């Protein structure tokens, strides 16, 4: 129950840091995507129902702070979450942080793919500007670099006393 309560606070804190602090400190092409790290963690963790609810919450937070069209990041984040869950059925997603960093890179590639394909399908391409590869690659490298200490933090949170799995999960 503790994990279900602390993860929404972490999601809100990461969204706030990403929208308010990092956007003021770093240039646009180097901003790490902190929500993608949390979604990758939730996708690689055994939480399914609570993980999907938290990813839904993360999508709503991202849309609130970014001003994107309604439902875009919500759909992208849920797609990435379920893609990682599906990938976990075929591959063994262990506790190795290096594997989770690779999953962050794959998630960012899937996010770029969906953000390139969805706006024309939804008819909102005139409202969006798509960055080039010279913006995407530094952001992906920075996100993978920031992901390392965040995954260590998430691992420490799992070992806290009183952290027990949710009764909704098998």
Language-model-detected regions and their locations in the chain:
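Terminal, non-globular segments
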Residues: 1-170
